[in-house]
Swiss-Prot record:
Description of how the protein assembles with itself and partners: The complex is composed of two ATP-binding proteins (SsuB), two transmembrane proteins (SsuC) and a solute-binding protein (SsuA).
Family (UniProt): Belongs to the ABC transporter superfamily. Aliphatic sulfonates importer (TC 3.A.1.17.2) family.
Catalytic activity, reaction form: ATP + H2O + aliphatic sulfonate-[sulfonate-binding protein]Side 1 = ADP + phosphate + aliphatic sulfonateSide 2 + [sulfonate-binding protein]Side 1
Protein name: Aliphatic sulfonates import ATP-binding protein SsuB 1
Role description: Part of the ABC transporter complex SsuABC involved in aliphatic sulfonates import. Responsible for energy coupling to the transport system.
Limits of the ABC transporter domain: 8-223
EC number: 7.6.2.14
Length: 245
């Protein structure tokens, strides 16, 4: 069991919209440096859970404890067109030499050296998403929330971004909760994968396969098959693999 401090603690979380219960008694703990991926069909409450962690939604019941420094990277980079790349990375921060240096260092970490003075419109989709990552990193988050951050990218760029995010998380050690529909992506990146179904966690599984993870590895295929079954794809034999502990 990890001895890292707990970054996220959720107990008995309930959230409804009108007559529809979206989250029904959810319990979740994420430790610092732990990469947790949330899978589930559309409309099962994945994004609602992220919004509760950011404070954009308020729970109807239960307790949500999160660190003060937290930030979100979305599917769309959300760069401000009228600000240059470095200014986008530093948006909302004080204009100091130290912050400028931190912004340039963050751009270097995401391999955007030399792009600081460019306009967002000149960036490719992958570069724009890397700028969004730099904007998150410069805030030194204790909790990093990723809302389908690679969904709009082509397959090759997506793989490169997965590798980059994995490296950055290993280096900076925030707690991470990522929402995705991509089972391959989940198994490739996660320390734990959770499947959300009808407002509850149907699966909470530790991924113990060594890194780097290859799709052809039998253990990886086993995890993928299990998660796909819980998502209603493939076979219907839903035997548990291994519970997170």
């Amino acid at each position: 069991m990890s001895t890292e401090p707990i970054a996220v603690s959720i107990t008995g979380l309930r959230k409804s919209f009108g007559d529809k219960t979206v989250l029904d008694g959810v319990d979740l703990t994420i430790r610092r440096g732990e990469f947790v991926v949330l899978l589930g069909p559309s409309g099962t409450g994945k994004t609602t859970l992220l919004r509760l962690l950011t404070g954009l939604e308020v729970p109807d019941a239960g307790e949500v404890l999160v660190p003060g420094r937290r930030t979100t990277v979305y599917q769309e980079p959300r760069l401000i067109p009228s600000k240059r790349v470095l200014a986008n990375v530093l948006v909302g921060l004080r204009r100091t030499r130290s912050n400028r240096a931190a912004g340039l260092a963050a751009l270097a970490e995401v391999q955007l050296d030399g792009k600081a003075d460019q306009w967002p419109a000149t960036l490719s989709g992958g570069e724009a998403q890397r700028a969004a990552l730099a904007r998150a990193l410069v805030r030194e988050p204790e909790l990093l929330l990723l809302d389908e951050p690679f969904a709009a990218l082509d397959a090759l760029t997506r793989l490169r971004m997965q590798d980059l995010v994995g490296d950055l998380v290993a280096r900076h050690r925030p707690a991470v909760l990522m929402v995705t529909h991509d089972v391959d992506e989940a198994v490739r990146l996660a320390d734990r994968v959770i499947v959300l179904d009808r407002g509850r966690f149907a699966v909470d599984t530790a991924i113990t396969a060594p890194r780097p993870r290859e799709r052809a590895d039998p253990d990886i295929l086993r995890y993928q098959t299990e998660f796909l079954a819980h998502l209603g794809v493939g076979g219907s034999d839903r035997r548990p693999i291994r519970s997170a502990s």
